[in-house]
């Protein structure tokens, strides 16, 4: 066997790469025949029956009075609208069946594009990866000479960068210390001792309160009784004294 024949025999069979269709794509003859077949079958099997049923139902609703009619055209606008909606619904319902026919075509760019569109994951997003996975890549185990070049985790970097700043802080941030180290001791103490040394008021009994009210009442009554006597004495002294026509007391 010649070397050229041996090399040709070992070459793997080349698969034809199908490019996805673009905007200016020209369908092949097989694809055109499938288009015509889909158009005919969707009209006869889906659009026409659904459109006819919609028009009949609409005419029945108009005749029974559920739908109003136009004064000029009657029930024609509503029946025509129902027929158009049924036609479009039939075309849309047959779309999935037409796509399955294109997928069965071999060496068809349109069929290949449809098959690629129904894959679960595209090629640029391989399985097993997620956008919420760990950001830090796993570093493989290195030999002893390269062990120091491994990436340090963020937690240790953060602690090494910001761990030394605690020495420069003027006061201590730990909770175990009794007082800050950089703050002076000229802080006014809380008036706890004054509050404790203040005399506590004894509760007043009912008898003591009644006696106090009685004393207050007697003092008020005494003051009221003394005031008329004093006013009468002042009036008598004023009458005994000689006064002028203006009411002024004349001196002897």
Curated annotation (Swiss-Prot):
<comment type="similarity">
    <text>Belongs to the OCIAD1 family.</text>
</comment>
<feature type="compositionally biased region" description="Low complexity">
    <location>
        <begin position="155"/>
        <end position="169"/>
    </location>
</feature>
<dbReference type="InterPro" id="IPR040187">
    <property type="entry name" value="OCAD1/2"/>
</dbReference>
<feature type="compositionally biased region" description="Polar residues">
    <location>
        <begin position="7"/>
        <end position="17"/>
    </location>
</feature>
<protein>
    <recommendedName>
        <fullName>OCIA domain-containing protein 1</fullName>
    </recommendedName>
</protein>
<dbReference type="Pfam" id="PF07051">
    <property type="entry name" value="OCIA"/>
</dbReference>
<feature type="compositionally biased region" description="Basic and acidic residues">
    <location>
        <begin position="232"/>
        <end position="245"/>
    </location>
</feature>
<keyword id="KW-0967">Endosome</keyword>
<dbReference type="InterPro" id="IPR009764">
    <property type="entry name" value="OCIA_dom"/>
</dbReference>
<feature type="compositionally biased region" description="Basic and acidic residues">
    <location>
        <begin position="198"/>
        <end position="217"/>
    </location>
</feature>
<feature type="compositionally biased region" description="Polar residues">
    <location>
        <begin position="170"/>
        <end position="184"/>
    </location>
</feature>
<feature type="domain" description="OCIA">
    <location>
        <begin position="1"/>
        <end position="112"/>
    </location>
</feature>
<feature type="region of interest" description="Disordered">
    <location>
        <begin position="126"/>
        <end position="252"/>
    </location>
</feature>
<dbReference type="GO" id="GO:0005768">
    <property type="term" value="C:endosome"/>
</dbReference>
<feature type="compositionally biased region" description="Polar residues">
    <location>
        <begin position="222"/>
        <end position="231"/>
    </location>
</feature>
<feature type="compositionally biased region" description="Polar residues">
    <location>
        <begin position="126"/>
        <end position="141"/>
    </location>
</feature>
<feature type="region of interest" description="Disordered">
    <location>
        <begin position="1"/>
        <end position="21"/>
    </location>
</feature>
